[in-house]
A protein has these predicted regions:
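Alpha-helical transmembrane segments of multi-pass inner-membrane proteins
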Residues: 3-14, 26-67, 72-140, 147-160
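Aromatic-rich transmembrane-lumenal/periplasmic boundary elements in polytopic membrane proteins
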Residues: 41-56, 163-180, 195
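Long extracytoplasmic/lumenal interhelical loops at the membrane interface
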Residues: 53, 172-187, 191, 195, ...
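Short, hydrophobic secondary-structure boundary micro-motifs
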Residues: 57, 94, 148, 167, ...
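A glycine-rich, aromatic-flanked flexible loop/lid motif
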Residues: 158-163, 204-208
Length: 211
C-alpha cells in the first residue's frame, strides 16, 4: 500500500514538472476530457442494458424502487462518482480553452453525458461534492451567477426522476443503514485519533479495520 502512495506522489511531481506551458496543459486536459466521456458512455450503456441493484452498496429497504447504480469501468459506483467529481471541473476547463466557438459549444454540451452518469451512480456524497465544486468554481469565476444557479437548482428539483429525488431525501436519514455505517466509521476514526494520533496505524484498510 505504501508503494501506491509513493508512486502517486512521484506521478504528481512528474505532472507538475511536465506541464510547463499552456499547450502541454491543454493536451493533458484533452486526455482527461476523453477519459471522462469514455467512462460516461460505458455507464450509460450499463443503464441501457441493465445493472442489478446491489444490497451491499445500497439499503434497498430505505431506497425502494431505486434502479441499479452504474459504475462504468470502476467496481464501485461511489468510486466512479469520486472520479467524475474530481475530473469534471478539469474537463470543463478544457472546453474553455478551445478557440473555435462551435467546438467549444459542442464539447461543453457533451459534458451532459458524464453529468447524467453522475446522477445514475446514485452517490449522495458525489452529488453533494459536485454541487460544492460548482459553487466554488462560480464563486471565483462568475460570482454574480450564484443566485441564478441556486434558483435554477430549486426549480429543477421537481423535474428530477422520482428515484433521484427520493435518494436525496435519504441524506442524513437514520433509517438508511449505509448512513449508520458511516457514523460507525467516523466514531472509529475519532478513537484512532485519540489512541494513535501521533504514530498512526499504517497505510490502507488492512491496518485500519483490525484496530
Amino acid at each position: 500500500m505504501s508503494a501506491f502512495y509513493v508512486t502517486s506522489f512521484l506521478l504528481a511531481l512528474t505532472l507538475a514538472a511536465g506541464l510547463s506551458d499552456r499547450e502541454k496543459l491543454k493536451k493533458f486536459l484533452a486526455f482527461l476530457y476523453l477519459a471522462v466521456l469514455w467512462t460516461a458512455l460505458s455507464a450509460i450503456w450499463q443503464r441501457l442494458t441493465g445493472v442489478a441493484a446491489n444490497s451491499s452498496q445500497t439499503d434497498l429497504a430505505a431506497n425502494a424502487g431505486m434502479p441499479g447504480r452504474v459504475y462504468s469501468t470502476f467496481e464501485n459506483p461511489n468510486n466512479y462518482a469520486e472520479f467524475l467529481v474530481l475530473l469534471l471541473p478539469l474537463a470543463f476547463a478544457y472546453t474553455t480553452m478551445l478557440q473555435n466557438r462551435r467546438a467549444r459549444l459542442g464539447a461543453t454540451c457533451l459534458l451532459a453525458l458524464p453529468l447524467a452518469a453522475l446522477l445514475m451512480t446514485y452517490s449522495r456524497s458525489g452529488w453533494v461534492s459536485f454541487a460544492l465544486a460548482v459553487l466554488v468554481l462560480l464563486f471565483f469565476c462568475q460570482r454574480r451567477m450564484l443566485p441564478l444557479l441556486l434558483l435554477a437548482a430549486l426549480l429543477a428539483l421537481p423535474l428530477l426522476p422520482g428515484s433521484v429525488f427520493r435518494r436525496i431525501l435519504t441524506i442524513g436519514s437514520t433509517s438508511d443503514s449505509s448512513n449508520l455505517y458511516r457514523v460507525y466509521i467516523w466514531q472509529g476514526t475519532l478513537r484512532l485519533l485519540r489512541q494513535f494520533g501521533l504514530t498512526g496505524v499504517g497505510f490502507g484498510p488492512e491496518n485500519f479495520h483490525p484496530v
